[in-house]
């Protein structure tokens, strides 16, 4: 795999996650979040000539990192459509699925993408640049209650209603188009000592809404449950409590709500058994080298 001219994304918990896939040389594997290709490259290094890796990413920029390898197929699509493409390629079952749910460093550091409050640019935040709705569309068209719900649910912000009210009032004077426009509206609502943390939560909430991240994750997790062979591994790296809760629930109970199904006799039916009872986190050395790994949590489960 050729190195990108600039570092697209430093893979987090690389060895821990790929080890967790329990790779067999001739297996069929899925990297649901290709990004800079770091995890895919490591997976390919452990496969023989009969194996195959299907890697998904909806961002056209990720295509610049793909590898020319007969054992590799790149699918430019959101991982929520995983079953459609596995069916298309005639794949009846896979041996492991890996998903690193973190936003690539590339996205945060590219001012044109609008993911970070550190740079001026358009308020965009689309992972898929061909998708219709931008963050600017959300803040300019959603009603006050809907905005408040987004900030409360996806950003866990206590002042979500004040935020929504300020946005609606400001857009009545002029449209909020750029990150600068947006910061001008919301910055006064936060104390200086917690400003960066609160702004990060606001931007997280908008990003989740724009990209429908929770809905996509839900669909992918249920699809993975069906796609994995018995003994197959589901390996997921999460970065915030909302997605981690969903992943934990699906692995423990087979249901994102955390309610395990029971058979006629009341016996609990769960599709997975946990490989690691406690989450795996980045060590001090990795956190020092890559601070964005600090919030990463790795969970691994095996299909019964």
UniProtKB/Swiss-Prot annotation:
Keyword Cell inner membrane among record annotations: no
Q: Which GO terms describe its biological process?
A: rRNA base methylation
In the record, which residues are listed under signal peptide? none
- One of the record's GO molecular function terms: rRNA (cytosine-N4-)-methyltransferase activity
Q: Which reaction does it catalyse?
A: cytidine(1402) in 16S rRNA + S-adenosyl-L-methionine = N(4)-methylcytidine(1402) in 16S rRNA + S-adenosyl-L-homocysteine + H(+)
Instruction: Show the coiled coil region(s).
Output: none
Q: List UniProt keywords, sorted A-Z.
A: Cytoplasm, Methyltransferase, rRNA processing, S-adenosyl-L-methionine, Transferase
EC annotation?
A: 2.1.1.199
| GO CC aspect terms | cytoplasm
Kindly list the places in or outside the cell where this protein is found, as annotated in its UniProt entry: Cytoplasm
Fetch the Pfam families from UniProt.
Methyltransf_5 (PF01795)
Q: Keyword S-adenosyl-L-methionine on this protein?
A: yes
Residues that coordinate or bind S-adenosyl-L-methionine = 37-39, 57, 79, 100, 107
Per the similarity annotation, which family is this?
A: Belongs to the methyltransferase superfamily. RsmH family.
Q: What does this protein do?
A: Specifically methylates the N4 position of cytidine in position 1402 (C1402) of 16S rRNA.
Query: What's the name of the protein?
Result: Ribosomal RNA small subunit methyltransferase H
Q: Which organism is it from?
A: Phocaeicola vulgatus (strain ATCC 8482 / DSM 1447 / JCM 5826 / CCUG 4940 / NBRC 14291 / NCTC 11154)
């Amino acid at each position: 795999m050729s190195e990108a001219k600039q570092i697209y994304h430093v893979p987090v918990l690389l060895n821990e996650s790929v080890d967790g896939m329990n790779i067999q040389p001739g297996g069929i594997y899925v990297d649901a979040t290709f990004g800079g290709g770091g995890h895919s490259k490591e997976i390919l290094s452990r496969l023989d000539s009969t194996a195959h890796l299907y890697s998904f990413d909806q961002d056209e920029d990720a295509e610049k990192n793909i590898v020319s390898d007969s054992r590799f197929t790149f699918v430019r699509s959101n991982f929520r459509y995983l079953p459609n493409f596995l069916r298309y390629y005639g794949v009846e079952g896979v041996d492991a699925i890996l998903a690193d749910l973190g936003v690539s460093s590339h996205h945060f550091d590219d001012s044109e993408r609008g993911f970070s409050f550190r740079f001026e640019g358009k308020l965009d935040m689309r992972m898929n640049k061909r998708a219709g709705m931008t963050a600017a569309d959300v803040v300019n068209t959603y009603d006050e209650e809907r905005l408040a719900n987004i900030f409360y649910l996806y950003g866990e912000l206590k002042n979500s209603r004040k935020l929504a009210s300020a946005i609606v009032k400001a857009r009545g004077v002029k449209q909020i188009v750029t990150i600068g426009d947006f910061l001008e509206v919301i910055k006064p609502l936060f104390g200086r000592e917690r400003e960066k943390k609160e702004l990060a939560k606001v931007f997280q909430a908008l990003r989740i809404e724009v990209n429908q991240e929770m809905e996509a994750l839900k669909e992918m997790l249920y699809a993975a449950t069906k796609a994995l062979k018995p003994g197959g591994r589901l390996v997921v790296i999460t970065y915030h409590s909302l997605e981690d809760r969903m992943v934990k629930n699906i692995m423990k109970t087979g249901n994102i709500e955390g309610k395990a199904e029971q058979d006629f006799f009341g016996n609990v039916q769960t599709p997975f058994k946990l490989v690691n009872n406690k989450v795996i986190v980045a060590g001090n050395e990795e956190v020092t080298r890559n601070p964005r790994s600090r919030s990463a949590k790795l969970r691994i489960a095996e299909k019964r």
